[in-house]
UniProtKB/Swiss-Prot annotation:
Residues 31-104 are annotated as: Viral RNA-binding. GO terms for cellular component: T=3 icosahedral viral capsid. InterPro entries: Levivir_coat (IPR002703), Phage_RNA-type_capsid (IPR015954). Pfam families: Levi_coat (PF01819). It comes from Enterobacteria phage GA. This is Capsid protein. The keyword RNA-binding applies. It is found in: Virion. GO terms for biological process: regulation of translation. The keyword RNA-binding applies.
Amino acid sequence: MATLRSFVLVDNGGTGNVTVVPVSNANGVAEWLSNNSRSQAYRVTASYRASGADKRKYAIKLEVPKIVTQVVNGVELPGSAWKAYASIDLTIPIFAATDDVTVISKSLAGLFKVGNPIAEAISSQSGFYA
Protein backbone atom coordinates (compact mmCIF):
# COMPACT_ATOMS: atom_id res chain seq x y z
CA MET A 1 0.00 0.00 0.00
CA ALA A 2 1.29 3.46 -0.88
CA THR A 3 2.12 5.78 2.00
CA LEU A 4 1.19 9.43 2.07
CA ARG A 5 4.49 11.30 1.78
CA SER A 6 5.99 14.41 0.20
CA PHE A 7 7.19 14.28 -3.40
CA VAL A 8 8.69 16.56 -6.04
CA LEU A 9 5.89 17.54 -8.40
CA VAL A 10 7.92 19.88 -10.63
CA ASP A 11 11.58 18.97 -11.07
CA ASN A 12 13.60 21.99 -12.17
CA GLY A 13 16.93 20.30 -11.66
CA GLY A 14 17.09 21.23 -7.99
CA THR A 15 16.62 24.98 -8.50
CA GLY A 16 13.07 26.05 -7.77
CA ASN A 17 11.62 22.53 -7.57
CA VAL A 18 8.01 22.33 -6.43
CA THR A 19 7.52 19.81 -3.63
CA VAL A 20 4.06 18.92 -2.38
CA VAL A 21 3.41 17.65 1.13
CA PRO A 22 0.47 15.59 2.39
CA VAL A 23 -2.15 17.69 4.16
CA SER A 24 -5.21 15.46 4.28
CA ASN A 25 -6.49 11.95 3.79
CA ALA A 26 -10.19 12.21 4.50
CA ASN A 27 -13.04 10.14 3.07
CA GLY A 28 -10.65 8.22 0.83
CA VAL A 29 -9.23 11.33 -0.86
CA ALA A 30 -5.54 12.07 -0.34
CA GLU A 31 -4.44 15.68 -0.76
CA TRP A 32 -1.02 17.31 -1.21
CA LEU A 33 -0.19 21.05 -1.28
CA SER A 34 2.97 22.97 -2.11
CA ASN A 35 2.45 25.61 0.60
CA ASN A 36 0.03 26.66 3.32
CA SER A 37 -1.95 29.09 1.18
CA ARG A 38 -4.49 27.14 -0.87
CA SER A 39 -4.96 30.05 -3.27
CA GLN A 40 -1.25 30.02 -4.18
CA ALA A 41 -0.52 26.30 -3.88
CA TYR A 42 0.07 23.56 -6.37
CA ARG A 43 -2.54 20.99 -5.33
CA VAL A 44 -2.83 17.28 -6.02
CA THR A 45 -5.71 15.05 -4.97
CA ALA A 46 -6.01 11.32 -5.53
CA SER A 47 -8.64 8.77 -4.66
CA TYR A 48 -9.13 5.05 -5.04
CA ARG A 49 -12.50 3.35 -5.34
CA ALA A 50 -13.80 -0.05 -6.31
CA SER A 51 -15.75 0.23 -9.56
CA GLY A 52 -18.01 -2.76 -9.67
CA ALA A 53 -16.77 -6.17 -8.57
CA ASP A 54 -13.98 -6.38 -11.11
CA LYS A 55 -12.39 -2.91 -11.43
CA ARG A 56 -10.38 -0.38 -9.43
CA LYS A 57 -10.77 3.29 -10.22
CA TYR A 58 -8.17 5.98 -9.49
CA ALA A 59 -9.06 9.67 -9.84
CA ILE A 60 -6.14 12.11 -9.88
CA LYS A 61 -6.52 15.89 -10.05
CA LEU A 62 -3.86 18.58 -10.37
CA GLU A 63 -4.07 22.36 -9.91
CA VAL A 64 -1.19 24.53 -11.14
CA PRO A 65 -1.34 28.22 -10.10
CA LYS A 66 0.11 31.23 -11.88
CA ILE A 67 1.77 33.09 -9.01
CA VAL A 68 1.91 36.88 -9.24
CA THR A 69 2.85 39.70 -6.90
CA GLN A 70 0.15 42.25 -6.10
CA VAL A 71 0.61 45.60 -4.39
CA VAL A 72 -2.01 46.22 -1.71
CA ASN A 73 -1.72 49.49 0.24
CA GLY A 74 1.93 49.73 -0.78
CA VAL A 75 2.74 46.18 0.35
CA GLU A 76 3.74 43.50 -2.15
CA LEU A 77 1.76 40.31 -1.59
CA PRO A 78 1.90 37.04 -3.53
CA GLY A 79 -1.29 35.87 -5.16
CA SER A 80 -2.65 33.62 -7.86
CA ALA A 81 -3.69 35.17 -11.19
CA TRP A 82 -5.25 31.93 -12.48
CA LYS A 83 -4.97 28.15 -12.23
CA ALA A 84 -4.64 25.37 -14.77
CA TYR A 85 -6.44 22.10 -14.02
CA ALA A 86 -5.81 18.50 -15.05
CA SER A 87 -7.87 15.44 -14.26
CA ILE A 88 -7.11 11.79 -14.96
CA ASP A 89 -9.46 8.88 -14.35
CA LEU A 90 -7.83 5.49 -14.50
CA THR A 91 -9.79 2.22 -14.38
CA ILE A 92 -7.85 -1.02 -13.97
CA PRO A 93 -9.32 -4.55 -13.94
CA ILE A 94 -8.70 -6.36 -10.64
CA PHE A 95 -7.03 -9.24 -12.49
CA ALA A 96 -4.23 -6.97 -13.82
CA ALA A 97 -0.89 -8.33 -12.64
CA THR A 98 1.88 -6.26 -11.03
CA ASP A 99 3.74 -6.16 -14.36
CA ASP A 100 0.58 -4.84 -16.06
CA VAL A 101 0.05 -1.99 -13.63
CA THR A 102 3.76 -1.11 -13.76
CA VAL A 103 3.41 -0.67 -17.53
CA ILE A 104 0.32 1.50 -16.97
CA SER A 105 2.24 3.74 -14.52
CA LYS A 106 5.15 4.05 -16.95
CA SER A 107 2.72 4.87 -19.78
CA LEU A 108 1.21 7.71 -17.75
CA ALA A 109 4.68 9.12 -17.04
CA GLY A 110 5.55 8.81 -20.74
CA LEU A 111 2.49 10.80 -21.82
CA PHE A 112 3.94 14.00 -20.43
CA LYS A 113 7.66 13.35 -20.89
CA VAL A 114 9.48 16.34 -22.39
CA GLY A 115 9.85 15.83 -26.13
CA ASN A 116 6.70 13.76 -26.59
CA PRO A 117 3.90 15.28 -28.74
CA ILE A 118 1.48 15.82 -25.83
CA ALA A 119 4.07 17.64 -23.71
CA GLU A 120 5.16 19.69 -26.74
CA ALA A 121 1.58 20.72 -27.54
CA ILE A 122 0.97 21.80 -23.94
CA SER A 123 4.26 23.71 -23.60
CA SER A 124 3.84 25.47 -26.96
CA GLN A 125 0.11 26.10 -26.43
CA SER A 126 -0.69 24.51 -29.77
CA GLY A 127 -2.43 21.52 -31.27
CA PHE A 128 -1.20 18.37 -32.96
CA TYR A 129 0.14 18.48 -36.49
CA ALA A 130 1.38 15.88 -38.96
